[in-house]
């Protein structure tokens, strides 16, 4: 039903406009019954109703948490949130590649800023006792010099940790100039240390790029162990492109969805061996319950999706948890 509607209606709309329409529907989903609580899953000291989460980038401003929870997501990672509000990159900046069940985005961390989003999360928690696990993905503002990046991450941690269940440090988006340079350990160490110092003891994850070399990923894993952080989110979007003649593949930005699955699994296997006892959240190319089970069998503790939700619709998370 949804796939037919997607092909007839949503596919013809600008991808970002369609996203805003979908967000309106999801906000109404907040009126649906709360999902049935199965046996909770304990990860990083947090109780999840299931292992399926919404990846960062879908709910940038913490406006859809209740609706996504009622659609079956056990956790929602909002953001990326920066210290100051910013509009992001010029439009168009979101593109579908339906033949590949993929998206390309160059959004550029458009968000309302840490103070406004912190207040929104505060109100949400005051008004609702039953919520999913809420992760807050944090980053630096576009105009902040790389040498000043630790201060941006520290500011976000101070403003948001109180209302987050966990923090995710984003140093891997391809859409903020120079951001990926912060994955080098000499740059990453002060960022992670200052986030830890300002996190109120909340679990901290590092979101990494699939385009990093295996050695660079192992260096990040070593740093996570040294600083005793909770774990890693693998992976963000990729700047590589699969073979194909689709016009959208020429657009710049990060590619997500089915073409990312192979590299995402490679990174998962690599990091599971390097991070015994740490939490790994696997992201990238997950579409079916079989995909979820494969990631769990490879050592992931939780999984996240975004593009799969776009292509398979509002019932997707519940289908995954039912094993369909």
Describe the role of every protein-language-model region:
Residues 1-42, 105-110, 114:
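An N-cap/entry alpha-helix motif that binds or orients negatively charged groups
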Residues 23-31, 173-184, 220-278, 316:
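Glycine/Thr-rich beta-alpha phosphate-binding loop at enzyme active sites
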Residues 45-53, 129-136, 198-212, 271-282:
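Short beta-strand/loop segments at the ligand-binding rim of alpha/beta enzyme cores
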Residues 61-68, 212-226, 273-275, 286-303:
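Catalytic cores of alpha/beta
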Residues 74-86, 173, 231-239, 286, ...:
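Glycine-rich phosphate-binding active-site loops on the catalytic face of alpha/beta enzymes
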Residues 79, 84-130:
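A gly/proline- and charged-residue-enriched helix-loop-helix capping module
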Residues 85-101, 241-256, 302, 308-324:
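C-terminal helical cap(s) of enzyme catalytic domains, especially alpha/beta-barrels
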Residues 141-153, 181, 206-225:
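Active-site glycine- and acidic-residue-rich loops that bind
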């Amino acid at each position: 039903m949804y796939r037919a509607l997607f092909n007839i209606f949503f596919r013809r709309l600008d991808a970002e406009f369609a996203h805003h329409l979908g967000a309106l529907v999801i906000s109404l989903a907040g009126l649906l019954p709360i999902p049935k609580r199965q046996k909770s899953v304990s990860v990083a000291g947090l109780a999840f109703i299931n292992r399926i989460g919404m990846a960062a980038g879908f709910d940038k401003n913490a406006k859809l948490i209740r609706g996504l929870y009622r659609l079956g997501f056990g956790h929602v990672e909002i953001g990326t949130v920066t210290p100051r509000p910013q509009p992001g990159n010029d439009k168009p900046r979101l593109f579908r590649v339906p033949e590949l069940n993929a998206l390309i985005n160059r959004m550029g961390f458009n968000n309302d800023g840490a103070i406004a989003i912190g207040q929104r999360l505060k109100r949400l928690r005051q008004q609702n006792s039953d919520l999913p696990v809420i992760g807050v993905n944090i980053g630096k503002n576009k105009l902040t010099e790389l040498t000043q990046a630790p201060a941006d991450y520290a500011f976000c941690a101070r403003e948001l940790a109180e209302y987050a269940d966990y923090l995710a440090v984003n140093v891997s988006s391809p859409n903020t100039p120079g951001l990926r340079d912060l994955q080098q350990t000499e740059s990453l160490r002060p960022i992670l240390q200052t986030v830890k110092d300002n996190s109120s003891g909340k679990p901290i994850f590092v979101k990494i790029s699939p385009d990093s070399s295996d050695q660079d990923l192992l260096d990040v894993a070593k740093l996570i162990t040294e600083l005793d952080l909770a774990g890693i989110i693998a992976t963000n979007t990729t700047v590589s492109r699969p073979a194909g003649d689709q016009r959208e593949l020429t657009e710049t930005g990060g590619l997500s969805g089915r073409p990312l699955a192979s590299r995402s699994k490679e990174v998962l296997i690599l990091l599971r061996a390097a991070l015994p006892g740490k939490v790994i959240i696997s992201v990238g190319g997950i579409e079916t319950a079989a995909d979820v089970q494969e990631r769990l069998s490879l050592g992931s503790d939780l999984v996240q999706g975004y593009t799969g939700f776009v292509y398979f619709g509002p019932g997707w998370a519940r289908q995954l948890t039912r094993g369909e």
